[in-house]
From Swiss-Prot:
GO cellular component, one term: ribonucleoprotein complex
Single biological process term from Gene Ontology: translation
Protein name in UniProt: Large ribosomal subunit protein bL9
Origin: domain of life: Bacteria
Organism from which the protein derives: Ligilactobacillus salivarius (strain UCC118)
Amino acid sequence: MKIIFTEDVRGKGRRGEIKELPDGYANFLIKQNKAKQANAQAMSQLKGQKRAEARKEAEELEEAKKFKELLESGERVVEMKAKAGTDGRLFGSITSKQISQELEKQYGMKIDKRKMELREPIRTMGYVNVPVKLHNEVTAKIRVHISEK
């Protein structure tokens, strides 16, 4: 029997996949609401869902590209002040959470701290480019300037 998986089934198939399975196992999956029979109506519904998902993915990509342009347009620099010693090293460090908060405070742009690809906290003064992963295919750079208090 041909079925369409409505959920991921370990070892058998992923959501949205169409497979030929033995009748007994197919009936079991249908009763568990993990699959449905692959008839013409279900196939057209699946195609519609895939088109909607593709459209949504394209919209998210466009949105990420626009946000990248906003972040990198002009001279957007996130200004931060921290206590520092005489050699230019900070007492403490600047984390992605602090950068995210300052970006929102100064420019009104909200970015999740987990999207910032800061390998380690910033411990020196000066300019630093912080990469931000907005989408699987889109990465922007935020310029951060750390000065002494």
